[in-house]
Amino acid sequence: MVMEVDEPAVAATTSQNQPQEHANDFDMDTSEGPIENDETFEPVDQINWKFNQVKGNIDADVHTEADVISCVEFSHDGEYLATGDKGGRVVIFQRDQSGKYVKGVRSREYNVYSTFQSHEPEFDYLKSLEIDEKINQIRWLKKKNAANFILSTNDKTIKLWKISERERKIGDDAWNLPRTNRINTSSFRGRLQIPSIVPMELIVEASPRRVYGNAHTYHVNSISVNSDQETFLSADDLRVNLWNLEITNESFNIVDIKPANMEELTEVITAAEFHPTQCNWFVYSSSKGSIRLCDMRDRALCDAYAKIFEEPEDPQSRSFFSEIIASVSDVKFSHNGRYLLTRDYLTVKVWDLNMESQPVETYPVHNYLRTKLCALYENDSIFDKFECDWSGDDKHILTGSYHNLFRSYARGNNQDAKTWEARPQEPHSQLRSRFVVPSAKRKRNNLSSSGETTEEDLSSDQLQFDRKILHTAWHPKDNIIALAATNNLYIFSDV
């Protein structure tokens, strides 16, 4: 049951019919804790990635559609890495616990920790629609005790899972009665024994704790846990709902952009996320390229945003594809809460929360595809939704592309952006960067100081659009990245 509330949750400082006036008063106070000092960003050096691991069968012909990875997410401390796939399964990896060190740092290998079936295929008999088991997103809750908790969602249903360990049991020789079906009265004679606890092989159990359903008419595209660790939001194409983790049968509708007449629909919600420290703030992005920042203290139904971030369109460059490639596929707050990172089809942008008119940084991802938009439209690749990520220190940016290529950017150093290809090679060996050129006419080799080739040309005509990196994750503390390439999970680091 979704509760639509029109009354203000908290008394607002301005009238509800004056959202623009309120928006002018909504300024980020950089003197408070959540938003760090207003610094001029210093350029940083590019990271040279090294291959660590690849999970899954690397034979391109040996996988099913259910094996395709659909989401990747590190835990808050980086000790665990969760993936979901189109078959409804969740696989959790744990960082190596053996104490092994590589080049003076703790091993950055991840091993399988737990695998379980999160969602099953369903059928909506009321609408005669099949509901896929595909996992759309996974979000970790902050660890409070020995157990871990994650939220996972498919198109309709969100589930809370508890991941716990069991490595001790009651010893078989510590019973006062024989462990048989028949009771022998003579067995009661003798001394009373106290059961003893003995070690056993580690068992990791995943148990469902809550199921949040029946609140979304359209497909859920985002979930985000609030900084208070008590509530979370879920977003579909037209609505954003607020949930309490302890309550499964009701949620509060906090954004509703559905028009009275669906023929007047001009945009849909593509992603939503809570601020990392301010529990009242959240953002949601749209298919028209705008990002809206909302404050739940203003009103319960946040249809009137506090700020809107959008870049004016150049009329000279407008085409049939302009609105499609402007659609924001992912939005992420920086760890310090000061910036927003957004990804559209061709670029990654960094927005300052204090400047709505234009991004402070724009990084091209694959501009060489601009001349191929017609072909990409015909094969539906233009609708692919790429994710983006911040590094733990907010100084680097990560996103994916086609042909299993990915790009990382050193902020403030746009000229030093490099492209790498996710492919198996020797552990801890440096990746060779790729340079995509419009045609295969030009070849160049850049040599490292050791004389090894570090860059390879790749013609844009050779790109394989069915091999793509849509889902990415960056370790919250170390320079470790995880990339989903079809059914493979690649892990790279700077060591």
UniProtKB/Swiss-Prot annotation:
<dbReference type="InterPro" id="IPR000009">
    <property type="entry name" value="PP2A_PR55"/>
</dbReference>
<dbReference type="GO" id="GO:0009792">
    <property type="term" value="P:embryo development ending in birth or egg hatching"/>
</dbReference>
<keyword id="KW-0677">Repeat</keyword>
<feature type="region of interest" description="Disordered">
    <location>
        <begin position="439"/>
        <end position="459"/>
    </location>
</feature>
<feature type="repeat" description="WD 2">
    <location>
        <begin position="130"/>
        <end position="171"/>
    </location>
</feature>
<dbReference type="GO" id="GO:0040028">
    <property type="term" value="P:regulation of vulval development"/>
</dbReference>
<feature type="repeat" description="WD 1">
    <location>
        <begin position="64"/>
        <end position="103"/>
    </location>
</feature>
<protein>
    <recommendedName>
        <fullName>Serine/threonine-protein phosphatase 2A regulatory subunit sur-6</fullName>
    </recommendedName>
</protein>
<feature type="repeat" description="WD 7">
    <location>
        <begin position="464"/>
        <end position="495"/>
    </location>
</feature>
<feature type="repeat" description="WD 3">
    <location>
        <begin position="215"/>
        <end position="253"/>
    </location>
</feature>
<dbReference type="InterPro" id="IPR036322">
    <property type="entry name" value="WD40_repeat_dom_sf"/>
</dbReference>
<feature type="repeat" description="WD 6">
    <location>
        <begin position="378"/>
        <end position="419"/>
    </location>
</feature>
<feature type="repeat" description="WD 5">
    <location>
        <begin position="323"/>
        <end position="361"/>
    </location>
</feature>
<dbReference type="GO" id="GO:0000159">
    <property type="term" value="C:protein phosphatase type 2A complex"/>
</dbReference>
<dbReference type="GO" id="GO:0005829">
    <property type="term" value="C:cytosol"/>
</dbReference>
<comment type="function">
    <text>Probable regulatory subunit of serine/threonine phosphatase let-92. Together with let-92 and constant regulatory subunit paa-1, positively regulates centriole duplication during early embryonic cell divisions by preventing the degradation of sas-5 and kinase zyg-1. In addition, during vulva development, may play a role with phosphatase let-92 and regulatory subunit paa-1 in the induction of vulva cell precursors by positively regulating let-60/Ras-MAP kinase signaling, probably by promoting lin-45 activation.</text>
</comment>
<dbReference type="GO" id="GO:0019888">
    <property type="term" value="F:protein phosphatase regulator activity"/>
</dbReference>
<dbReference type="Pfam" id="PF00400">
    <property type="entry name" value="WD40"/>
</dbReference>
<dbReference type="GO" id="GO:0002119">
    <property type="term" value="P:nematode larval development"/>
</dbReference>
<dbReference type="InterPro" id="IPR015943">
    <property type="entry name" value="WD40/YVTN_repeat-like_dom_sf"/>
</dbReference>
<dbReference type="GO" id="GO:0040026">
    <property type="term" value="P:positive regulation of vulval development"/>
</dbReference>
<dbReference type="GO" id="GO:0098534">
    <property type="term" value="P:centriole assembly"/>
</dbReference>
<keyword id="KW-0853">WD repeat</keyword>
<comment type="subunit">
    <text>Part of a complex consisting of a common heterodimeric core enzyme, composed of catalytic subunit let-92 and constant regulatory subunit paa-1, that associates with a variety of regulatory subunits which confer distinct properties to the holoenzyme. Interacts with let-92.</text>
</comment>
<comment type="similarity">
    <text>Belongs to the phosphatase 2A regulatory subunit B family.</text>
</comment>
<feature type="repeat" description="WD 4">
    <location>
        <begin position="264"/>
        <end position="304"/>
    </location>
</feature>
<feature type="compositionally biased region" description="Polar residues">
    <location>
        <begin position="12"/>
        <end position="21"/>
    </location>
</feature>
<dbReference type="InterPro" id="IPR001680">
    <property type="entry name" value="WD40_rpt"/>
</dbReference>
<feature type="region of interest" description="Disordered">
    <location>
        <begin position="1"/>
        <end position="27"/>
    </location>
</feature>
<keyword id="KW-0963">Cytoplasm</keyword>
